[in-house]
Amino acid sequence: MATPTRRRLGRALGFALVATAALAAVAHAAGLGGPPTIEIDIRYSHFTPSAVQVPVGVPVTFVIRNDDPIDHEWIVGDEAVQQFHRTSADPLHVGDPTAVSVPALTSVTTTVTFTTAGHEAYICHLPGHEAYGMVGWVTINP
């Protein structure tokens, strides 16, 4: 026959196991343990934060929220990528996780895996936006 102390210990252990399982389920549902997520806000034609750090070779999910009443874009890449988009006439981007259109007052989610350590810019190349300061930087850490 179990003593009251053993029963309390057993109940406490059972409760601890259930609580641990519940916390693990919540953490998994919240995305903890999944790919890193970085939120970038667009307000007054500026990116916040204007600099982020990511690990090389790991998928990173970016949630880009446009709080402005005008459209923007988020182009991430090296100088060659940025130069291409500066001279490109296509303001609508579909299917490329490193070049996304962000309509006014909406959010867009994209996932990017950076394969080389270093620095890349994220810029909005819609007319006048880069000159106004819509530029940010990604530092890709080894």
State where each predicted segment sits.
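Boundary at the C-terminal end of the N-terminal hydrophobic targeting segment
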Residues: 27-31
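Beta-strand cores of secreted/periplasmic/IMS beta-sandwich domains, seen most often
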Residues: 51-75, 107-116, 120, 140-141
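Bacterial N-terminal signal peptides that target proteins for export
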Residues: 3-15
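Short aromatic-acidic-glycine turn motif
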Residues: 80-90
